[in-house]
Amino acid sequence: MISKNLSEEELKNANTRSKALLEFGNTKRPILDFLLLNAEKAGYKKVVIVIGEQGALFKEYYGNQLKDNNFRSLSISYAIQYIPVGRDKPMGTADALFQALEQYPILKTASFTVCNSDNLYSVKALQALLICKDSNAFINYERDALQFPMLKIQRFALTLVDENFHLETIVEKPSKNEVSNYKDVKGRYRVSMNVFKFTGTEIYSFLKNCPIDPKRNEKELPTAIL
């Protein structure tokens, strides 16, 4: 929802640029700054931002070099998600991560955290994934703790895990009829907000071979995970 109190310039930006680059307050700095600050506080040192082929605006804020720009104590690099011939929009989140691994081969054998650029994840959540000893993990939020109405929850992804908290299924933007199928054994809803830890050697082939979702015509990260 876009506020009617926005200025003409703010309204234009809200409709034309990535949500991560919307400017906050009088600083003229993007919302993404806050996520990067939390990543820094959590102990991260290197960040790769996946941008589109027309992603010059990201470079205006975080450095013009393809690799190793300095932002506070972080090293910022970019991976470019190219659009395949015959399409007019990117191929989806699984493809975005796949292209990042192709452009930064070191990630194919490393562990790393993946998240959306337009969600503000807490220091605690980011740190939990950084220090997690499992090779793959994700933050599975409890819906009641998020204090979001169910209508908003339906815009995220609902999950089911087994008794050992291993992921069994995940559904993006479930319909009203699907929602009731995703209560856990205690009757609670669990929500994925797309913040994961992956190990390249284990996720790479699933990204590469991820099928195209027939409804969205994209390669979705939840599909690759499952």
Identify the meaning behind each predicted range.
Residues 122-201:
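Conserved core of the sugar-phosphate nucleotidyltransferase
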Residues 57-60, 124, 224:
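Phosphate- and divalent-cation-binding pockets in alpha/beta enzyme and binding domains
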Residues 75-158:
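Conserved beta-loop-beta/alpha segment of the NTase-like Rossmann-fold superfamily
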Residues 58-62, 129, 207:
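Hydrophobic packing residues within well-ordered alpha-helices of enzyme cores
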Residues 1-15, 23-111:
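Conserved N-terminal catalytic core of the sugar/cofactor nucleotidyltransferase
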Residues 38, 99-103, 128, 202-206, ...:
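Alpha-helical scaffold segments in soluble metabolic enzymes
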